[in-house]
Amino acid sequence: HEAMIIREERIGNQRLLLGDCREIIGGLTFDAIVTDPPYGLGKRMQGGTWGAKDHNSGFLKWDLSAPDWLPEAIGQTPAIVWGGNYLPFPPSRCWLMWNKVNAVPTMADFEQAWTNLDRPSKRMDLPVGRVEYGHPTQKPLALMEWCLGFLPDAKTILDPFMGSGTTLVACQRMGRH
């Protein structure tokens, strides 16, 4: 699987792999998955709404179903998947909810993460960050640290999508890999 890795970087104690996650994932070992898959690919934000006149135009196939390899990659591995309520995962006993206490009125008041954890659902009240990092759906660092708190025995965390790197920063701050 190393041939599928385009580039490898070290950031602190973290290992960042550049490549197609669908090809790389089979050769990796990890204790848990914490991720926020991309969604709304091909859509443009227009005044706080998603293409208000033609709501369904512009969505790519990615948005219509879970990546076929993701449920298999999860298997029995503890997992937290943001946006999982939009994907056809099995029923969950434990949903994590981020209550955006200062959400923009035209956007969602909260976000949900699907988990395969055997515990009651939980909610975190946390303001939406006002810092612009160039990523349209960046999760707050405190939110990702909260997620890692549900996985105390997981030392190696997989985030196959990376996004703005918030999971990586949370892992670094919490002594995870």
Q: Residue ranges of each PLM-predicted region?
A:
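Class I S-adenosyl-L-methionine-dependent methyltransferase catalytic core
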Residues: H1-L158, M162-H177
